[in-house]
């Protein structure tokens, strides 16, 4: 599955637009790692546990979006975007969305 943030696929033509596809996940912090990150917040530096959570959330959301596109028979997703939001204390949502298409050689 080709996943692009662009509107077009260089050297290819869009044969059919399948529609909007999306994937999301809500991730919570681990209390032990959260305490360690709180100390890091005091002295500065990267909060590795939060970076890991966001990386995992992106991968899951994109994977779910790709699964939805494949179920529609698409072979690419164009105009893919990622959005994150804080839902509650210690929880964050990651959403991936884009347009599922079938492309062919131009």
UniProtKB/Swiss-Prot annotation:
Pfam families: YbjQ_1. Gene3D superfamilies: Hypothetical protein apc22750. Chain B. Coiled coil: none annotated. Disulfide bonds: none annotated. It comes from the Bacteria. Belongs to the UPF0145 family. This is UPF0145 protein CPE0882. It comes from Clostridium perfringens (strain 13 / Type A).
């Amino acid at each position: 599955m080709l996943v692009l943030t662009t509107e077009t696929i260089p050297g290819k033509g869009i044969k059919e637009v399948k529609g909007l596809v999306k994937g999301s996940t809500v991730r919570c912090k681990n209390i032990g790692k959260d305490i360690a990150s709180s100390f890091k917040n005091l002295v500065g530096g990267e909060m590795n546990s939060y970076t890991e959570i966001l990386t995992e959330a992106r991968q899951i959301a994109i994977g779910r979006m790709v699964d939805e596109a494949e179920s529609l028979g698409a072979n690419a997703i164009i105009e893919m975007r990622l959005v994150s939001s804080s839902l509650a204390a210690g929880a964050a949502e990651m959403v991936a969305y884009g347009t599922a298409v079938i492309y062919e050689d131009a």
